[in-house]
């Protein structure tokens, strides 16, 4: 469409709910320069096209379902959901009154406008079941949702200048039955599709055309009127009410016959005539001129003049269109011609314009079809001035405007085009100036120059459509891929969460080993992710490995934080495995805080998968880019814990003495030393002893010892699998070092004691021996196994003792589930041991408090006594049974 002026002009924007406006409820009416608009909410707006301002907004007590304007009386009728019918006088002085700032709705337009609350007295017909209405000169027609049937009611309209409340009811008839929607008991549920009412008058009727809008009312030519509604309606010159129901029925009621039926009752079913059944919800009923000569004459009519239409149309929600027209049959007889067309759907709204054109909107486009083109030529036996037929098929022409939920067609403009007033799903009010004569295909000849220009336009349009289709296809592919990924993620989550205590379909195992990097030994952790399920881990999956040291776990107020490693999982199919190696220490201070907890978790990123599919980054389509942020998931993703492994001192011990002499590796390096200390040591005289704290402690102080005793019977029951024929002490040491790299050598040599090196270089001695506990059981001594840890480093002995106690706790918990019973014990002896331990613990607290207040000279004796008490606590006289 050529022209300097823009075809679409946006007038104003109105607030709308998330997801856009729903079709069926919004309404746009235009009278002269004023636009009356309802978005389906509680507000009805009045917009001045000449001034470009929102002049007023009326607030109703509930959603507004339908609007009609009685132009000569300046009355606006509004159907309020579950309330009834309201009538507002547009000339009322209340429209110009000043309102407070609280009554202004700044979101509903470019400038604040007064919001006028509708007075409850404006409700002229209260009825919670009222679903549709239409107006005639002296009659108000309503459609009520009954318990099981629709009910049409007629009321007298007051004369101009009187109270707008309708008079008494003058007629009533029941229409077809329906299945009521589910709702709250005692409160009728709103139908998903509202019925459509409109009035039809014959051309000879004196009823003025004072209703605006496509479904308000129209006049039909006598030929079509008589064929559709019969001789009674034609003789009575009676208006007829057309009703389109949500079940697809298109029926009619002759008003004068309905009024007179009260005085002469008869069969009520005879008052209702079913014209057609679309088999889908009826959303629009209208009429238009299709004959070429009549259509041209109709376009030159003044807005207030009646146009005698020769074609009746009705639209269904899913795209089915019905057109009815008076036509000649083969015998030369005038008969009604009914044609059904299948157009793209779903249809959101429709309107009839000039030139025999019908406009209808879908979520993706606004289309126009021409019912005046393709009319069958007149035969020799038909009258020369007779009507032509309907086209056998319709080809919708795209106007490249999408998501229009309400439409109003204005008369032909001064420039010769057609003007549409439209409301989009995003709440934008716009005008569309169309010159459809250059857009619609026709039989008129064109020059070579115009044909070439037309071909260029068509090729350009094909290119744009092809490009848009490619973007849409890519967006659909991305969303399908995201849905497939989400389905796989759901399957993986269900498989992991439902595995319980059995083998997990996706597992992650952790092992440790020492490696030498440059001049320093580093403890490395190897995490193996294995997929034993039938699902694949593709886009969006990440393996998260968190390393938490003991200092961070115990000191909640410390500044240290856990280290988390994230490894993207790419194409890990069924049966595949992925190996990740990462350092555990020593840290920057040269030490290794044990125990270290390694937690493995699978993380699925919802924002990476879903966010990329909802808003493609390379799309040039504005409708794809405008992805509301609230559609994206609130959570970042889904976490699925896989494993939790604790690395303790027993796993980190190294045993250089176990290697054969000819293959013995050099002694493990300790933590990185201070360069100054290294320099002083090199300057030391040959033959002198080192003077470091560790050397002095090892030379002059006896090693610290900690022990724990376990029942031999308990150990045999726990170690019976895999250790048969092995001495109990050797089996116990092998069990303690099961996760150490040297366990195979310990097993091969059948050792019961071993000396290793801690990560800081201090020696740690493990001794396992059998002992007899004689004082616990009155029946005799209890055979036990004593596990003793010796080291000159207090920190290392505490870590090793903690590791041994942790293994014992796990073993006792597992054996307790098997229901083993303990022997009879001397309770008094146990109480005495417990009392002695309580005394030692109180003494420890006293000595620690004293160290905080004493000077340096007297604190040495206190510290020495504190060490003695700790040694006694590490040698309990109790036994694990």
Curated annotation (Swiss-Prot):
Recorded superkingdom: Eukaryota
Gene Ontology MF annotations: DNA binding
Short name of one Pfam family: FANCAA
Any one GO cellular component localisation term in the record: chromatin
Biological process annotations from GO: interstrand cross-link repair
Residues bearing the modification Phosphoserine: 667
Residue span of region Disordered: 94-119
Principal cellular location given in the protein's record: nucleus
Protein role: Plays a role in Fanconi anemia-associated DNA damage response network. Regulates FANCD2 monoubiquitination and the stability of the FA core complex. Induces chromosomal instability as well as hypersensitivity to DNA cross-linking agents, when repressed.
Full protein name: Fanconi anemia core complex-associated protein 100
Species lineage: Eukaryota, Metazoa, Chordata, Craniata, Vertebrata
């Amino acid at each position: 469409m050529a022209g300097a002026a823009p075809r679409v002009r946006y007038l104003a924007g109105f607030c709308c709910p998330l997801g856009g406006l729903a079709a069926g409820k919004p309404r746009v009416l235009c009278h002269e320069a004023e636009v009356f608009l309802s978005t389906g909410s509680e507000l009805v707006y009045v917009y001045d096209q000449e001034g470009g301002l929102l002049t007023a907004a009326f607030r109703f007590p509930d959603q507004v379902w339908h609007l009609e304007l009685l132009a000569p009386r300046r009355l606006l009728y509004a159907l309020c959901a579950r309330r009834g019918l309201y009538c507002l006088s547009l000339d009322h002085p209340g429209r110009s009154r000043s309102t407070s700032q609280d009554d202004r709705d700044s979101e509903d337009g470019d400038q604040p406008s007064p919001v006028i609350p509708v007075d409850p007295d404006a409700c002229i017909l209260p009825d919670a079941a009222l679903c549709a209405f239409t107006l005639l000169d002296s009659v108000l027609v309503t459609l009520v949702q009954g318990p099981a049937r629709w009910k049409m009611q007629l009321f007298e309209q007051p004369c101009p200048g009187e109270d707008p409340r309708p008079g008494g009811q003058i007629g009533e008839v029941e229409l077809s039955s329906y299945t009521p929607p589910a709702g709250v008991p005692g409160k009728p549920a709103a139908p998903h599709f509202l019925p459509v009412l409109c009035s039809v008058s014959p051309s000879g009727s004196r009823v003025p055309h004072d209703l605006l809008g496509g479904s308000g009312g129209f006049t039909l030519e006598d030929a079509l009127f008589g064929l559709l509604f019969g001789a009674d309606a034609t003789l009575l010159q009676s208006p007829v009410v057309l009703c389109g129901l949500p079940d697809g029925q298109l029926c009619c009621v002759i008003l004068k016959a309905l009024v007179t039926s009260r005085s002469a009752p008869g069969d009520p079913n005879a008052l209702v005539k079913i014209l057609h059944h679309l088999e889908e919800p009826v959303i629009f009923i209208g009429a238009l001129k299709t004959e070429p000569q009549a259509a041209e004459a109709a376009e030159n009519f003044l807005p207030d003049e009646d146009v005698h239409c020769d074609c009746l149309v009705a639209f269904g929600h899913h795209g089915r269109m019905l057109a009815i027209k008076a036509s000649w049959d083969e015998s030369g007889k005038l008969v009604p011609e009914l044609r059904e067309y299948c157009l793209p759907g779903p249809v959101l709204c429709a309107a009839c314009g000039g030139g025999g054109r019908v406009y209808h909107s879908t979520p993706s486009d606004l289309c126009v079809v021409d019912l005046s083109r393709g009319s069958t030529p007149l035969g020799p036996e038909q009258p020369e001035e007779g009507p032509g037929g309907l086209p056998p098929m319709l080809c919708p022409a795209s106007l490249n405007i999408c998501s229009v939920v309400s439409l109003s067609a204005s008369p032909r403009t001064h420039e010769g085009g057609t003007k549409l007033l439209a409301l989009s799903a995003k709440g934008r009010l716009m005008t569309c100036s169309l010159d459809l004569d250059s857009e619609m295909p026709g039989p008129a000849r064109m020059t070579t120059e115009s044909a070439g220009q037309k071909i260029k336009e068509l090729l350009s349009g094909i290119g744009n459509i092809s490009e848009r289709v490619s973007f849409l296809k890519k967006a659909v592919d991305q969303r399908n891929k995201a849905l497939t990924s989400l389905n796989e993620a759901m399957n993986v989550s269900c498989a992991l969460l439902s595995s319980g205590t059995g083998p997990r379909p996706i597992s992650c195992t952790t092992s440790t080993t020492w490696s030498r990097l440059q001049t320093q030994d580093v403890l490395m952790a190897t995490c193996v992710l294995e997929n034993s399920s039938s699902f694949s881990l593709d886009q969006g999956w990440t393996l998260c490995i968190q390393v938490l040291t003991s200092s961070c776990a115990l000191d909640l107020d410390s500044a240290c934080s856990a280290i988390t490693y994230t490894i993207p999982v790419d194409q890990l199919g069924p049966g595949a495995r992925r190996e990740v190696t990462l350092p555990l220490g020593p840290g920057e201070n040269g030490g290794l805080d044990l125990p270290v907890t390694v937690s493995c978790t699978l993380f699925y990123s919802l924002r990476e998968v879903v966010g990329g599919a909802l808003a493609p980054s390379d799309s040039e389509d504005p409708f794809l880019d405008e992805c509301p942020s609230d559609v994206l998931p609130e959570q970042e993703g889904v976490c699925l814990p896989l494993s939790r492994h604790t690395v303790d001192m027993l796993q980190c011990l190294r045993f250089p003495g176990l290697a054969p002499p000819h293959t013995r590796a050099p002694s493990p390096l300790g933590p990185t030393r201070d360069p100054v200390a290294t320099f002083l040591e090199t300057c030391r005289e040959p033959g002198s002893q080192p003077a470091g704290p560790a050397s002095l402690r090892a030379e002059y102080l006896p090693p610290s010892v900690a022990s724990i005793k376990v029942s031999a019977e308990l150990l045999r029951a726990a170690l019976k699998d895999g250790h048969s024929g092995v001495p109990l002490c050797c089996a116990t040491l092998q069990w303690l070092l099961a996760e150490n790299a040297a366990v195979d050598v310990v097993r091969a040599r059948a050792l019961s004691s071993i000396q290793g090196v801690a990560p800081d270089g201090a020696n740690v001695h493990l001794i396992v021996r059998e002992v007899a506990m004689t004082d616990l059981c009155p029946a005799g001594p209890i055979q036990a196994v004593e596990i003793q840890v010796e080291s000159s480093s207090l920190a290392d002995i505490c870590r090793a003792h903690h590791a041994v106690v942790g293994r014992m706790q796990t073993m006792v918990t597992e054996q307790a589930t098997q229901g083993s019973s303990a022997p009879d014990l001397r309770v008094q002896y146990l109480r005495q041991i417990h009392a002695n331990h309580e005394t030692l613990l109180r003494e420890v607290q006293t000595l620690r408090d004293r160290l905080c207040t004493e000077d340096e000279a007297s604190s040495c004796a206190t510290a020495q006594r504190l060490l003695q008490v700790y040694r006694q606590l590490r040698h309990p006289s109790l036994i694990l049974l």
